[in-house]
């Protein structure tokens, strides 16, 4: 018994959350932006057993009980969702031991109660998900995609220049002309591809991730169709990286479920046929716009997402074209969702993505993108994205009105996940950035 108590005390001292049942919470005196288009200027939210049971104007009705939170006029929204994130840095076991708890807490501190990993160390990400779901650490609900290739690997050409210290492929995206490949890579046997999908399902992954870069006469489109067919048989959705318009078209023609990026290479304002094909597919698209705008450090140095100097000017052109393409598709009715595709601190990534979205979207648009659109894109509309009875009690309270200034979304004061307070920064919040 003494040993058990010692372990328990150690966990508490380190700020580690032990598994606990969902709780009840009552939030009063709040501005409520419920995600359906309705705003309640003075209202209450009641959650029981980790589920929302009431969202009302005025005070709570009936016998509401639980942790009481007076919002003092602050704004309550549904918990944020990042539908495209990469989490691990460096060797997986060392990261899990040394950084995971702090990193996961930083997500909920920034308001993110749900995160989708779009490609991390396979064993590490499943272990991280297990620890989060068991309550061994405080953090978001985590979903994980398994990457499956569309062609066999090929060695780099002998003439290829040696890579520098910063090796992020987005610096010189091979999807960008004139660097697109001109030779088709070897195909992968269909049954090998199907077996990889089945293995991902057996291992417990939530989705499949693919990278589409079409080549002349190449196998990519066929293999993606095979993956989609097998994934849907296994109950898995398929997310596809396609950064150029031709690759996005090939992906939707294979009937994928989600485009994991805004297609930022190619001018949709000059290609009405491509716009129509993308819209007619009804495939959601995830933003990830801030990859191609500089992230500024404390010394005002423009950095790329790998921490190195921002590689102007070629990626910067996508910083302009991506938002243009996004707005064109939005105006046509595309379900446009939120994701970052970075490894910066979640608060900083959020600020960067808002800067990019703010170029072409209104605060009202961005709230829809961040909430119900992203919930729909990851197939969780029945659980997340809006404040409605029956949905998961994942809530964010922010200081200020995001409809007046969208960057108020970053002024997170308190976060509730499954009816439990998991972050409380009232009185010690960052100034808006």
Predicted features and spans:
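Histidine-rich, glycine-flanked metal-binding segment
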Residues: 32, 36-77
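Metal-associated gating/positioning segment near the N- to mid-region
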Residues: 74-136, 152-167, 246-260
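Histidine/acidic-residue-rich catalytic or RNA/ligand-binding cores of hydrolases
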Residues: 91-94, 125, 248-256, 291-307, ...
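Divalent metal-dependent hydrolysis catalytic cores, especially in the metallo-beta-lactamase
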Residues: 103-123, 139-147, 203-216, 237, ...
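Active-site gating loops and adjacent loop-to-helix segments of metal-dependent hydrolytic enzymes
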Residues: 105-110, 134, 138, 152-182, ...
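Active-site core of metal-dependent hydrolases
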Residues: 210-319, 344, 376-378, 396-399, ...
């Amino acid at each position: 018994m003494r040993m058990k108590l010692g372990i328990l005390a150690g966990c508490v001292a380190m700020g580690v959350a032990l598994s606990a049942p969902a709780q009840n919470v009552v939030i009063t005196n709040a501005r409520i932006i419920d995600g359906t288009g309705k705003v309640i200027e003075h209202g209450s939210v009641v959650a029981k057993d980790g589920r929302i049971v009431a969202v009302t104007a005025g005070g709570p009705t009936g016998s509401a009980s639980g942790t009481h939170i007076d919002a003092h006029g602050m704004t309550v929204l549904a918990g944020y969702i990042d539908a495209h994130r990469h989490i691990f840095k460096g060797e997986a076991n060392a990261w899990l031991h040394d950084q995971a708890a702090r990193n996961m807490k930083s997500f909920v501190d920034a308001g993110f109660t749900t995160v989708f990993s779009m490609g991390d160390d396979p064993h590490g990400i499943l272990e991280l998900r297990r620890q989060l779901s068991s309550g061994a650490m405080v953090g978001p609900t985590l979903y994980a995609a398994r990457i499956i290739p569309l062609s066999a690997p090929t060695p780099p050409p002998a003439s290829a220049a040696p890579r520098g210290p910063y090796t992020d492929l987005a610096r010189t995206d091979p999807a960008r002309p004139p660097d697109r490949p001109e030779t088709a890579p070897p195909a992968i046997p269909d049954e090998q591809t199907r077996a990889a999908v089945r293995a991902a399902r057996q291992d417990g992954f939530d989705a499949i991730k693919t990278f589409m870069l079409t080549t002349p006469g190449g196998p990519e489109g066929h293999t993606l169709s095979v993956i989609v067919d097998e994934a849907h048989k296994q109950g898995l959705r398929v997310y596809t990286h396609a950064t150029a318009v031709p690759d996005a078209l090939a992906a939707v023609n294979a009937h994928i479920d989600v485009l994991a990026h805004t297609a930022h290479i190619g001018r949709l304002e000059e290609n009405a046929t491509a716009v129509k094909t993308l819209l007619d597919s009804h495939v959601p698209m995830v933003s990830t716009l801030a990859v191609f705008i500089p992230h500024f450090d404390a010394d005002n140095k423009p950095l790329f997402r790998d921490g190195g100097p921002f590689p102007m000017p070629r990626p910067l052109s996508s910083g302009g074209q991506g938002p243009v393409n996004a707005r064109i598709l939005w105006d046509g009715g595309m379900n446009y969702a939120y994701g970052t595709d970075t490894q910066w601190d979640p608060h900083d990534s959020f600020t960067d993505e808002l800067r990019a979205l703010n170029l072409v979207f209104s605060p009202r648009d961005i709230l829809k993108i961040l909430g119900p659109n992203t919930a729909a894109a990851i197939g969780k509309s029945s659980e997340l994205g809006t404040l409605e009875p029956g949905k998961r009690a994942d809530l964010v309270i922010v200081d200020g009105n995001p409809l007046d200034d969208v960057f108020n979304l970053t002024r997170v004061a308190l976060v509730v996940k499954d009816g439990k307070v998991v972050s409380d920064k009232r009185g010690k919040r960052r100034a808006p950035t």
